[in-house]
Amino acid sequence: MSKVWSNLAKVVYRRTYSRNDYGLQENWADTVERVIYGNVKGLNVSEAEIARLRYFMMERKAMPAGRGLWYSGAPSHEKLGGAALNNCWALTADSWENFVIAQDLLMLGGGVGLSVEYRYTSKLPRVKKDVSIVHQATKDADYIVTDSREGWNELLRRVLESFFVTGKSFSYSTVCVRPEGEPIKGFGGTSSGPRPLVEMISNIGGILKARQGR
């Protein structure tokens, strides 16, 4: 890093934007290259334009958004595409599937505005009666939640489909979800463990059971 970096800037950069995807901690030059090529990939951008962008970033005369600084060009960018670069989305509560989409987008790190006006919620199906979603601590459950964003979203999809479409009860297990505090490589941070997921499903079940038949 350049000597002109303040101590606070160094701490913030190391803590928030310097990635360690391949076993080596990025320095600022590494981050600049990752972000540049993550943004220009597939575009008709000249070497002169890339050099100009590199100059402005190295001298910190111009910066991408913080989300782009962390995510652009990372392995998870290759896997997920540009959705995780967005800060916010807007959805309407006119289908149960939109609640699954909302959770997926939230787990990408953005904010989701969900309109629950009656003109939208009145389009939701009636809640099926006598649906029971049971959490088990074994691998004998009907659905084993995988240790991934996709696994959590699939569980929510199954729960809502049971209450709004099939009326079928089922059990699920979180034995494969990593324990609380373990690192998350793709987006950084640490795992919350399965407890918030179990609590969420329990709360959703309670709300929908109170509305069964309506």
Describe the residue ranges of each PLM region.
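Extended catalytic cores of very large enzyme megasubunits
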Residues: 1-214
